[in-house]
Regions:
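Conserved S-adenosyl-L-methionine
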Residues: 40, 116-120
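Intrinsically disordered, low-complexity segments enriched in Gly and acidic/Ser/Thr residues
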Residues: 95-96, 102, 126-135
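Conserved beta-strand signature within the Rossmann-like core of class I S-adenosyl-L-methionine
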Residues: 115, 138-147
Length: 189
């Protein structure tokens, strides 16, 4: 019988299989030279898979149970990783930060970014806090989960198109909340 960790790991691998509706990119080559924002990082397997391609990654993760594991996992790459212990949102306070504020306060460029966003139904709120970055960032792209809320696909696609971003829906469906739903919308400038 497989141990829980083996089953969980296999699930993560299946999630990013080339045929999966939940796959974030067609090829990791797309991230070459990019700054990755892993929003809702959890175990950060996507960042780990792309670490050799990206310039830097910001891991946005608030769940303290992940922090020690993230620090250990990325110890060999500590110059390429920053763990941010805040929720990405449309407000700024002790626990939350908007992407626009994050980049302004850090003095970092909003160009050449890839946003991976899987935050359990808070994706549209996080996008509301990234208006400046999405409007003015050059060579910006990403993948956003669109299955957590019933109308995410329609609402999030509409929001992204307001910024003249091109979009595509990852083929396939997930069974979620007793419905077959598209899982990922990709966007790029």
């Amino acid at each position: 019988m497989l141990a829980f960790t083996e089953v969980a790991y296999r699930g993560l691998l299946i999630e990013q299989d080339k045929r999966s509706a939940h796959r974030y990119v067609d090829s990791y080559e797309e991230l070459k030279g990019k700054t990755l924002l892993d929003i809702g990082a959890a175990e950060a397997i996507f960042t780990l898979d792309t670490i050799e391609y990206i310039d830097h990654a910001y891991l946005f993760e608030c769940d303290e149970s992940w922090i020690e594991a993230l620090e250990a996992t990325f110890a060999p790459y500590k110059e390429k990783i920053t763990i941010v212990r805040k929720y990405v949102s449309d407000v700024n306070d002790e626990d939350n930060i908007t992407l626009d504020t994050f980049f302004r306060d850090e003095g970092k460029s909003i160009d050449n970014l890839f946003l991976k966003m899987n935050i359990e139904g808070y994706e549209r709120i996080a996008l509301e806090g990234a208006v400046h970055s999405l409007e003015h960032g050059r060579q910006i792209g990403g993948s956003v989960c669109i299955y957590h809320l019933h109308d995410d696909k329609k609402v999030i696609e509409s929001e992204l198109k307001k910024f003249n971003l091109k979009t595509s829906i990852q083929p396939g469906y997930l069974y979620f909340e007793k419905e077959m739903r598209s899982a990922i919308i990709r966007f790029w400038s």
